[in-house]
Amino acid sequence: MDLTTWAIFPLLLGSIGVYSLYKLLQRLRSGAYLQDAVVVITGATSGLGRECAKVFYAAGTRLVLCGRSEEGLKNLVQELSQMRIKSAQLHKPHMVIFDLSDVEAVNSAANEILHLTGRVDILINNAGISYRGTILDTKVSVDRMVMDTNYFGPVALTKALIPSMIKNRRGHIVVISSVQGKISIPFRSAYSASKHATQAFFDCLRAEMSPYEIDVTVVNPGYIKTNLSLNAVTGDGSNYGVMDNNTAEGRTPEEVAQTVLRAVGERRKELLVAGLVPTLAVYLRTLAPTIFFSFMAARAKKERKLKDS
């Protein structure tokens, strides 16, 4: 080795050491931040919500699991109770059953949550519904239904719980949005509109909550291998019932749940959890919108031909 190499080598080792120490301290802070925190998760009975329940339970949080199915929530609580984890003190989860699209039910649910736990430290707005259809064939009632579940529901629950967070000078609001909160793709109009609205609301909320030391994290995943597309609604409100190829090849909910856990522990403001192509599309939409629009027009034409064939 020459003298230059010998000079760089200690600097490289030192940099690696400092970075490793930083990551270790970050993990320790994350663990302390999550231990015994009251965490509310909506849409907890399936998919990403279910996996989030597992990883946050394992982290020693006090869970409040929310969903429409009492049976589904009971099955999840039983599954959690059978987990064997030695690294954290575990707490039996609470269950709150309600329909997120019913604003009156949301307000009652928020009161029930606060009655059960006394406070909410972390709210994870996860519940949602997907959509497939053409704009021309989609009833306005379907647009409203998707907006009620994906936008107005999380907004109502967040607004109902924020006052208690402000009172305690502690809180963290998380929303599981989508890459489609950043870009719009053909035949997803109602879904993408709801996620764009979600992105905008929680971006505003982040700024307005900063004086109260309340964190806001927006997670924008790409395709996740769940039943979201199977349970999607179509333009007339019927069930789509098809597992899209992109969804089938997406990230596992376990992987995304771990990413959400880290994002919360690190108190990230925003996180894009997507592959190379969707990530590039997000930047292309901003930096070269004309090219992006051309790609989307070509995609719409291709998908329309496939449906007509």
Curated annotation (Swiss-Prot):
Recorded superkingdom: Eukaryota
EC numbers: 1.1.-.-
InterPro entries: NAD(P)-bd_dom_sf, Sc_DH/Rdtase_CS, SDR_fam
Stated role: Putative oxidoreductase.
Similarity comment text for this entry: Belongs to the short-chain dehydrogenases/reductases (SDR) family.
Active-site residues per Swiss-Prot or TrEMBL entry: 191
GO CC term (a single one): endoplasmic reticulum membrane
GO MF term list: oxidoreductase activity
Segments on the Cytoplasmic face: 1-4
Annotated residues for binding of substrate: 178
Name listed for the protein in its UniProt record: Dehydrogenase/reductase SDR family member 7B
Topology class, membrane: Single-pass type II membrane protein
Gene3D superfamilies: NAD(P)-binding Rossmann-like Domain (3.40.50.720)
Residues spanning the membrane: 5-25
Pfam families: adh_short
Chief localization: endoplasmic reticulum
Residue numbers on the Lumenal membrane side: 26-272
Binding site for NAD(+): 46, 48, 191, 195, 226
Sorted UniProt keywords: Endoplasmic reticulum, Membrane, NAD, NADP, Oxidoreductase, Signal-anchor, Transmembrane, Transmembrane helix
Cellular localization per UniProt: Endoplasmic reticulum membrane
